[in-house]
Amino acid sequence: MYPPEEKVRLGLDLKGGVHMVLRVQTDDALRIETETSLERVREILEVRSIGVGAMTMESPTRFRIEGVSPAQDAEFRAITDEQLLVVYRRESSAGGRYAFEMRPNMAVSLREESVRQALQTIERRVNELGVNEPIVAPHGVGGDQILVQLPGVSDVARAKEIIRSTALLELKLVEQGPAISRETLLQANGGRLPDGMEVVPGTDDTLTPGAAPQSVFYLVRRVAAITGRDLRTARSTLDEYNQPAVSFLLNGDGARKFGNITSQNIGRQLAIILDGRVYSAPVIESRITDEGRITGYFSQEEAADLGLVLRSGALPASLTYLEERRVGPTLGADSVRAGILA
């Protein structure tokens, strides 16, 4: 007689584990597309010296640009024709005011693609966890739900955190900071957030030597120099103080961009941001091409889990848990014994 595991596929009913239904927040994917489009146009307008007034995002699918001068209106239209009109419809009104609304077919396509990407990312993360014969599949009729079944998983909390972690890695040049408050950071600009910038929170242990780490804020470029899409791989490691950290390698395109950014900004800080929080902001001391390291206050397990989710890729949108059912090992063991006796 052989152990049942070698002969029978042991699902939740036999092995125990967890059954979950998740919803992909597809509005996130639309918002990211709109934010990226708006910032891309902002940068092009600055390079072309085309002055505009307010640039405002009104919803995940709509933004507005105002104050286009009549003398530059034709050039503005040409730029937005090239950069935006495949994805957005343009509306114009008096006074150089323009609104851009995402085309309905593009919104549907982006929502569907975000669910497909989320499903693939979850599959990779579950496989890295070493779960035997998991189920990751579309679920329900709304098109935005994913079924996950993990047989034999005992640490459900860890599995849930790994699955839902957005793992959005961004490397951004620091304009100012760290500062102890958002208000202090923006004082130099009259309390106003400069165009093309954002304030990101983080933790810093260098402001007061020997003191506990404290919350700080950084003013950084809104558009990232490097993102998780540029990663080739990531692994847990140790830093120079023998503390857990995560090292990463960039792909060819990422290495080229990283080399350009670091060579042109020696002496400046580069913020390493994960899910909207600065983990470290080292000073660029020389040109760097294909590798870097994320330091923080990680346990060994946290560093290993971070390496796992970075390797598997960032989620295109956040996830929420709609349903969770746990099947205990006692029920699973009873089911196996009943099958053998039958």
Positions of the model-derived regions?
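Juxtamembrane "pre-transmembrane" interface segments
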Residues: 149, 302-342
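Non-transmembrane, solvent-exposed regions of membrane trafficking/translocation machinery
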Residues: 25-283
